[in-house]
Amino acid sequence: MAEIKNYTLNFGPQHPAAHGVLRLVLELDGEVIQRADPHIGLLHRATEKLAESKTFIQSVPYMDRLDYVSMMVNEHGYVLAIEKLLGIEVPERAQYIRVLFDEITRVLNHLMWIGAHALDVGAMAVFLYAFREREDLMDVYEAVSGARMHAAYYRPGGVYRDLPDAMPQYKASKIRNEKALAKMNEARSGSVLDFIDDFFTRFPKCVDEYETLLTDNRIWKQRLVGIGVVSPERALQMGLTGPMLRGSGIAWDLRKKQPYEVYDRMDFDVPVGVNGDCYDRYLVRVEEMRQSILIAKQCIEWLRKNPGPVMTDNHKVAPPSRVGMKTNMEDLIHHFKLFTEGFHVPEGEAYAAVEHPKGEFGIYLVSDGANKPYRLKIRAPGFAHLASLDEMARGHMIADAVTIIGTQDIVFGEIDR
């Protein structure tokens, strides 16, 4: 009698559902996955090593390029670690701006996730809806930093600059008539804060639209319910964090459990799943978008009433003002020294973690008293999530592997780093 053997299948690295450069070696029995072996390192750029030869401030742009969908939250973890070692206080207004932009970034990430995840499973429309809203948030990034993605907006000691008074306007072109242009610029007539406020006022309706398309959709439920179930105990053992952990029913959120910046003053809830399957993780992330709206609204309200500095007054860390630099020789020398040599950080080590849209993003920083890190270790949430893929995919079909990769919300910039 013929012997029945399992066969091996390569999934990726150029598969559209592999989310970048994932190579999965699947061992299949018919169409059922017996083993899933992720091969990583195809996007390795030696970020941790490069940081050792750059001054502390020069490594901020590297952080944007780790998880390139949640740019500012990566920077946040890095600057928090530096601030811990320096022992400096960040002005209150800068803390509120950081929290506001963390939540904007969370929404940006979850919009990308819901669009891509639905597209992988076969729902095309959601992708188009989600990117409509991402466009507005990208414009907010551009307004404060000049870049749509890699912002490098956070600085050790605060943020690069205060929120501008004017929002960039759409310019006239051949493809837009006057009426369409006026409608597009309607919300852009005020300040950046007005634009963000307007966005978060209309955004709940947009989230309702995504839910209309997906939550009770029969096909969506058939593809997600009961797939990739992780028990609360296993979720903890495998080092899952963020929505992956909360989807399994554990209410662990660093914004509540280990508050940083002004999160302890924010009023919001932590959404938690029940069954620990892909559908619960979907519901958790959708509810997280709604909670981000609440947090952002509270920040906007405070920022309107409380003007103030957005950078520490510690001159070892903060650059001089532009006016001072162009009128005063000492300020010019100070500016030159700060951006060529950088500041020296006292000897020691620090770990700072933030509640990243994907989980716990941590930076472990070791300083030997020089102007560069002695060692920088990045704790990427996606790394632990990808490690759990084998266990989650076992016994499921090939098509379900796509769903599981989608629910893990994997980005390879941070995994391979």
From Swiss-Prot:
<keyword id="KW-0830">Ubiquinone</keyword>
<keyword id="KW-0520">NAD</keyword>
<dbReference type="GO" id="GO:0050136">
    <property type="term" value="F:NADH:ubiquinone reductase (non-electrogenic) activity"/>
</dbReference>
<dbReference type="InterPro" id="IPR022885">
    <property type="entry name" value="NDH1_su_D/H"/>
</dbReference>
<keyword id="KW-0813">Transport</keyword>
<keyword id="KW-0997">Cell inner membrane</keyword>
<dbReference type="GO" id="GO:0048038">
    <property type="term" value="F:quinone binding"/>
</dbReference>
<dbReference type="InterPro" id="IPR001135">
    <property type="entry name" value="NADH_Q_OxRdtase_suD"/>
</dbReference>
<keyword id="KW-1003">Cell membrane</keyword>
<comment type="subunit">
    <text>NDH-1 is composed of 14 different subunits. Subunits NuoB, C, D, E, F, and G constitute the peripheral sector of the complex.</text>
</comment>
<protein>
    <recommendedName>
        <fullName>NADH-quinone oxidoreductase subunit D</fullName>
        <ecNumber>7.1.1.-</ecNumber>
    </recommendedName>
</protein>
<dbReference type="InterPro" id="IPR014029">
    <property type="entry name" value="NADH_UbQ_OxRdtase_49kDa_CS"/>
</dbReference>
<keyword id="KW-1278">Translocase</keyword>
<comment type="function">
    <text>NDH-1 shuttles electrons from NADH, via FMN and iron-sulfur (Fe-S) centers, to quinones in the respiratory chain. The immediate electron acceptor for the enzyme in this species is believed to be ubiquinone. Couples the redox reaction to proton translocation (for every two electrons transferred, four hydrogen ions are translocated across the cytoplasmic membrane), and thus conserves the redox energy in a proton gradient.</text>
</comment>
<keyword id="KW-0472">Membrane</keyword>
<dbReference type="InterPro" id="IPR029014">
    <property type="entry name" value="NiFe-Hase_large"/>
</dbReference>
<comment type="similarity">
    <text>Belongs to the complex I 49 kDa subunit family.</text>
</comment>
<keyword id="KW-0874">Quinone</keyword>
<dbReference type="GO" id="GO:0005886">
    <property type="term" value="C:plasma membrane"/>
</dbReference>
<dbReference type="Pfam" id="PF00346">
    <property type="entry name" value="Complex1_49kDa"/>
</dbReference>
<dbReference type="GO" id="GO:0051287">
    <property type="term" value="F:NAD binding"/>
</dbReference>
